[in-house]
Curated annotation (Swiss-Prot):
This is Serine/threonine-protein kinase SSN3. ATP binds at I38, S39, S40, G41, T42, Y43, G44, R45, V46, K114. Component of the SRB8-11 complex, a regulatory module of the Mediator complex. One of its GO terms (cellular component) is mediator complex. It holds the Pfam family Pkinase. It comes from Cryptococcus neoformans var. neoformans serotype D (strain JEC21 / ATCC MYA-565) (Filobasidiella neoformans).
Length: 466
């Protein structure tokens, strides 16, 4: 409060706002009912939750001091009229550009809650604040709003823990790939595949148009709602790239980006300055995986040594050369300036064949589909197709085009819903489920993800990045 001549005071409007906000704030378990555990990874744990009804108590305004209530009160005829309807909720209508947090969610809405893990030194948990990855993810999700990006509902800070509440998606590309490879044992219908890739490119084009690199595109991070809308998730490695914050550019912040099977050759060769082309290479890898139901460049990742120096990923480079043939300076003039170019030459020889064409045509007879894949797998990042140009490619006009709201339109396939387990042994804060229903963890980025069932007892799993 500010003092004025005569001894009076002026009520600070922000003080009133903060007092009201603090009175109305509810904890995560008082706001959402945890339905089950979805997955766990390096940075967090993800739960499926449903919104609880608001408590039947006196209004927050009546809980404030009388002077504050008077300052906040308005005559009934002056109250603002509602500007939202149920149909305008972007969680119900993905075409809307309004932010999900612009209106209160309704009871029964389902969400995915990501809880960040605290740092760990030995066996002791430490709370040193939010990680760079977490801060970046929150910032970008709050700023970016698009039909093909996962929507952030709210961020909750409680008991030194941070929770991100996202819209819920029943499927992801990895689940769809697993269903076709293990259950249906049949390829993804060409029309469905084109729509999946088209919506993915729409989201990627939006990110690149706003100078954002995703840097971790892979099937497990590409979600699909039950309405058939593709949603790009996990912006933990994403960052702005038009004005690098460090003198070392993008390399200075994160030296290792993109999961190894989807990593572009310029990253493998140690590029310190790179562009949105790294995301397009990953999209090409995803396209090939949707087509063949298995990763096209499945190399073994070399781990860092005790000196924390980054090793050259020879095996991954070899897998790429097995499909595309060895790269030559005529194909990529800038390769001779790559930090790892001499290492690449010294660790050969690499296969000299180029079986991409027969590999593709054994799975599809579309010449346009092959053309766009070749342009995504261009060695030279400066020549690699952009998301904008890819969306204009004639392949997307085949068989009636992709001008549909749902990627599942015209398909008779019913994909299983996302697996959710009862698990609470790793997180006492979220442990609202009965102990008798406790189980293991669910794989979120493994080809061994089972394809059906809602509540299951899973087998042991490998850690995934969440």
């Amino acid at each position: 409060m500010a003092t004025i001549p005569g001894g009076g005071t002026i009520m600070d409007p922000m003080h009133l706002y903060r007092a009201r906000r603090d009175k109305e704030r509810r904890g995560v378990l008082k706001t959402y009912k945890i339905l089950g555990f979805i997955s766990s990874g390096t940075y967090g744990r993800v739960y499926k939750a449903v919104l609880l009804p608001p408590p039947k108590t006196a209004s927050a305004k009546s809980a404030l001091p009388s002077s504050t209530r008077a300052a906040l009160s308005l005559p009934k005829d002056k109250l603002p009229s509602p500007s939202f309807t149920e149909d305008s909720d972007p969680l119900n209508n993905p075409e809307m550009c309004m932010r999900p947090g612009d209106r209160p969610a309704k009871r029964g809405d389902v969400f995915a809650i990501k809880k960040f893990k605290p740092d760990k030194e030995g066996d002791v948990l430490t709370y040193a604040g939010i990680s760079q990855s977490g801060a970046r993810e929150i910032m970008l999700n709050r700023e970016l709003h698009h039909r093909n990006l996962v929507s952030l509902r709210e961020v909750i800070l409680e008991d030194k823990s941070i929770y991100m509440v996202f819209e819920y998606a029943e499927h992801d590309f990895l689940q769809i790939i697993h269903y076709h490879s293990q259950t249906a044992r049949a390829s993804i219908p060409p029309s469905t595949l084109r729509r999946l890739l088209h919506q993915l490119l729409c989201g990627v084009h939006f990110l690149h148009s706003n100078f954002v690199l995703h840097r971790d595109l892979k099937p497990a991070n590409i979600l699909v709602t039950s309405q058939g809308v593709v949603k790009i998730g996990d912006l933990g490695l994403a960052r702005l790239w038009h004005k690098p914050l460090a003198q070392q550019g993008l390399y200075g912040g994160d030296k290792v980006v993109v999961t190894i099977w989807y990593r572009a050759p310029e990253l493998i060769l140690g590029a310190k300055h790179y562009t949105a082309a790294v995301d397009i290479w990953a999209v090409g890898c995803i396209y090939a995986e949707l087509l063949s139901l298995r990763p096209i460049f499945k190399g073994d990742e070399a781990k860092m040594d005790g000196k924390k120096s980054l090793p050259f990923q020879r095996d991954q480079m070899g897998k790429i050369c097995e499909v595309l043939g060895p790269v030559k300076p005529e194909q990529w003039p800038g390769i001779v300036h790559m930090p790892e170019y001499r290492t690449y030459q010294a660790t050969g020889p690499y296969p000299h064949s180029n079986p991409l064409a027969p590999w593709y045509h054994a799975r599809s007879n579309s010449s346009e589909g092959y053309d766009i894949l070749v342009k995504m797998f261009e060695w030279d990042p400066a020549r690699r197709i952009t998301a904008r140009d890819a969306l204009r490619h004639p392949w997307f006009q085949e068989e009636g085009g992709v001008d549909t709201k749902s990627v599942f339109e015209g398909s008779s396939i019913t994909y299983p819903t996302r697996r959710v387990t009862h698990e609470d042994n790793g997180d006492a804060k979220m442990g609202s489920l009965p102990q008798s229903m406790a189980g293991g963890r669910l794989p979120s980025s493994s080809n061994f993800r089972p394809a059906s069932g809602n509540i299951v007892q899973p087998a042991a799993r490998k850690k995934a990045r969440i």
